[in-house]
Protein backbone atom coordinates (compact mmCIF):
# COMPACT_ATOMS: atom_id res chain seq x y z
CA UNK A 1 0.00 0.00 0.00
CA UNK A 2 2.73 2.45 0.96
CA UNK A 3 5.01 1.37 -1.89
CA UNK A 4 2.27 1.79 -4.47
CA UNK A 5 1.66 5.34 -3.25
CA UNK A 6 5.38 6.10 -3.47
CA UNK A 7 5.60 4.69 -6.99
CA UNK A 8 2.49 6.51 -8.18
CA UNK A 9 3.51 9.85 -6.68
CA UNK A 10 6.92 9.64 -8.37
CA UNK A 11 5.59 8.23 -11.65
CA UNK A 12 7.83 5.18 -11.17
CA UNK A 13 10.88 7.31 -12.01
CA UNK A 14 12.59 8.23 -8.73
CA UNK A 15 12.88 4.95 -6.83
CA UNK A 16 13.25 1.36 -7.89
CA UNK A 17 10.44 -0.98 -6.93
CA UNK A 18 12.66 -2.49 -4.23
CA UNK A 19 13.45 0.93 -2.76
CA UNK A 20 9.75 1.83 -2.68
CA UNK A 21 8.96 -1.49 -0.99
CA UNK A 22 11.70 -0.97 1.61
CA UNK A 23 10.45 2.55 2.34
CA UNK A 24 6.93 1.17 2.61
CA UNK A 25 8.09 -1.55 4.99
CA UNK A 26 9.50 1.07 7.33
CA UNK A 27 6.21 2.97 7.20
CA UNK A 28 4.25 -0.22 7.85
CA UNK A 29 6.43 -0.97 10.87
CA UNK A 30 5.83 2.60 12.09
CA UNK A 31 2.07 2.08 11.88
CA UNK A 32 2.33 -1.35 13.46
CA UNK A 33 4.27 0.11 16.39
CA UNK A 34 1.79 2.97 16.80
CA UNK A 35 -1.09 0.48 16.76
CA UNK A 36 0.61 -1.74 19.35
CA UNK A 37 1.01 -4.75 17.06
CA UNK A 38 4.78 -4.94 17.61
CA UNK A 39 6.91 -3.94 20.57
CA UNK A 40 9.83 -1.51 20.49
CA UNK A 41 12.41 -4.30 20.42
CA UNK A 42 10.97 -6.03 17.37
CA UNK A 43 10.38 -2.67 15.66
CA UNK A 44 13.99 -1.61 16.24
CA UNK A 45 15.33 -4.94 14.95
CA UNK A 46 13.29 -4.65 11.76
CA UNK A 47 14.25 -1.03 11.09
CA UNK A 48 17.92 -1.77 11.78
CA UNK A 49 17.83 -4.68 9.33
CA UNK A 50 16.30 -2.55 6.58
CA UNK A 51 18.80 0.24 7.24
CA UNK A 52 21.74 -2.17 7.45
CA UNK A 53 21.24 -3.12 3.81
CA UNK A 54 20.72 0.54 2.83
CA UNK A 55 17.76 -0.32 0.59
CA UNK A 56 15.35 2.38 1.78
CA UNK A 57 16.42 5.85 0.61
CA UNK A 58 16.37 8.46 3.34
CA UNK A 59 15.10 12.00 3.05
CA UNK A 60 12.14 11.32 0.78
CA UNK A 61 9.77 14.28 0.74
CA UNK A 62 6.09 13.84 -0.05
CA UNK A 63 3.05 15.94 0.68
CA UNK A 64 1.36 13.92 3.43
CA UNK A 65 -2.17 14.71 2.28
CA UNK A 66 -1.41 13.70 -1.32
CA UNK A 67 0.29 10.56 -0.06
CA UNK A 68 -2.75 9.69 2.06
CA UNK A 69 -5.14 10.30 -0.84
CA UNK A 70 -2.99 8.18 -3.14
CA UNK A 71 -3.36 5.20 -0.82
CA UNK A 72 -7.07 5.01 -1.60
CA UNK A 73 -6.19 4.19 -5.22
CA UNK A 74 -4.41 1.01 -4.13
CA UNK A 75 -6.01 -2.33 -5.02
CA UNK A 76 -6.25 -3.14 -1.31
CA UNK A 77 -8.53 -0.15 -0.63
CA UNK A 78 -12.17 -1.19 -0.28
CA UNK A 79 -15.35 0.61 0.71
CA UNK A 80 -13.53 3.89 1.27
CA UNK A 81 -10.99 2.33 3.61
CA UNK A 82 -7.34 1.52 3.14
CA UNK A 83 -6.36 -2.00 4.15
CA UNK A 84 -2.90 -2.51 5.56
CA UNK A 85 -0.97 -5.74 5.98
CA UNK A 86 1.02 -5.04 9.14
CA UNK A 87 3.62 -6.97 11.09
CA UNK A 88 2.09 -8.50 14.21
CA UNK A 89 5.07 -10.13 15.85
CA UNK A 90 7.63 -12.56 14.51
CA UNK A 91 6.53 -14.26 11.28
CA UNK A 92 3.00 -12.96 11.65
CA UNK A 93 0.88 -10.25 10.04
CA UNK A 94 -2.54 -8.77 10.60
CA UNK A 95 -4.81 -7.13 8.02
CA UNK A 96 -6.48 -3.96 9.28
CA UNK A 97 -8.73 -1.34 7.74
CA UNK A 98 -9.48 0.74 10.82
CA UNK A 99 -6.34 2.88 11.08
CA UNK A 100 -7.15 6.53 11.64
CA UNK A 101 -5.95 9.18 9.24
CA UNK A 102 -3.78 10.58 12.02
CA UNK A 103 -2.14 7.18 12.61
CA UNK A 104 -1.45 6.75 8.91
CA UNK A 105 -0.04 10.26 8.48
CA UNK A 106 2.18 9.79 11.54
CA UNK A 107 3.44 6.48 10.16
CA UNK A 108 4.82 8.16 7.05
CA UNK A 109 7.74 9.61 8.98
CA UNK A 110 7.92 12.56 6.62
Question: Which residues are covered by each model-predicted region?
Answer:
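Active-site segments that bind and position negatively charged phosphate/pyrophosphate groups
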Residues: 1-62
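C-terminal charged capping/lid subdomain of soluble metabolic enzymes
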Residues: 37-110
